[in-house]
């Protein structure tokens, strides 16, 4: 009934309902029915860091229901969001729109820019992973970094799917995850043959060798990334916008770590931090004091 009335006064009350998985799909459909007049409201909610992540990550799902150039443009704008989880949601929604309507106006230059950004983000994560200490309990951080690198790789392939045939690119992505060396090699060869040089260099530099140091060397040449030490790498994570990586980095800080990192633990206990960061910092501070 609300959907039929299209009374925009309900929009403000409906947006918070997106966080409930039971009703998220229905709420998305209702909000989509309001059409372009409310697009700016939805974008504002997406970029509002004061809103719950569970709400923000459902916003792109509204636009994927509306096959229009305006929807594509809004989702393109959302890819500027620094939070990788939210960027993923925007890219995934664009994939859905392209699957439904390939003739929509996708800004290819902007997709190229984001392909480059995601590739650089991968190598930054790799550079941080490569300098992790082995004498402290940091397994959870190393695992988290690897997971984030895998997620970045998926975003890269989803972006590539906006430039090329989505099914072909998805098949190549799945092949890369195969346990068979031959299947993975075939995927690398396919990417090399299908993609233009300007795009494939950002992906091939990641997938064409399993050796992490060799991979990092290629990334450093490609993006002019400089080597960093352990302390600098940790500070980048602790000052970053990825809550999970911040928490994992905090957890790995032992009593033997540099004073600058101990100070970050103290800072992270304050109430103005996300609950996960605050709780982890409180635990680590107590653990290190008892060490």
Predicted regions, residues:
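Structural detector for internal amphipathic alpha-helices that build alpha-solenoid repeat scaffolds
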Residues: 1-5, 13-16, 24-37, 44-47, ...
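Short inter-helical turns and helix N-cap capping residues of alpha-solenoid HEAT/ARM repeat scaffolds
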Residues: 7, 19-23, 50-52, 82-85, ...
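Extended alpha-helical surfaces
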Residues: 34, 103-104, 108-152, 159-165, ...
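Amphipathic alpha-helical scaffolding segments comprising HEAT/armadillo-like alpha-solenoid repeats
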Residues: 5-18, 36-48, 68-80, 99-114, ...
């Amino acid at each position: 009934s609300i959907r039929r009335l299209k009374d925009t006064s309900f929009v403000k009350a409906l947006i918070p309902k997106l966080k409930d998985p039971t009703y998220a799909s229905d709420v998305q459909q209702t909000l989509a029915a309001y059409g372009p007049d409310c697009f700016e409201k939805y974008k504002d909610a997406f970029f509002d860091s004061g809103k719950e992540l569970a709400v923000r990550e459902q916003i792109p799902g509204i636009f994927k229901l509306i096959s229009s150039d305006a929807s594509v443009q809004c989702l393109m704008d959302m890819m500027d969001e620094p939070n990788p989880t939210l960027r993923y949601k925007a890219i995934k929604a664009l994939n859905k729109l392209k699957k439904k309507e390939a003739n929509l106006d996708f800004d290819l230059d902007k997709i190229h820019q984001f392909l480059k950004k995601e590739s650089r983000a991968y190598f930054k994560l790799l550079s941080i992973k490569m300098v992790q200490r082995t004498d402290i309990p940091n397994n959870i951080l190393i695992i988290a970094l690897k997971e984030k690198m895998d997620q970045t790789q998926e975003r890269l392939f989803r972006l590539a799917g906006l430039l090329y045939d989505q099914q072909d690119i998805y098949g190549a992505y799945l092949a890369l995850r195969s346990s068979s060396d031959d299947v993975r090699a075939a995927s690398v060869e396919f990417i090399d043959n299908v993609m233009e040089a300007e795009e494939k260099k950002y992906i091939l530099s990641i997938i064409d060798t399993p050796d992490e140091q060799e991979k990092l060397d290629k990334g450093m040449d490609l993006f002019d990334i400089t080597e960093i030490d352990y302390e600098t790498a940790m500070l980048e994570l602790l000052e970053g916008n990825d809550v999970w990586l911040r928490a994992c980095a905090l957890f790995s800080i032992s009593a033997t770590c540099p004073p600058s990192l101990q100070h970050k633990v103290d800072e992270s206990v304050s109430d103005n931090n996300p609950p996960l960061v605050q709780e982890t910092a409180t635990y680590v501070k107590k653990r290190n004091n008892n060490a």
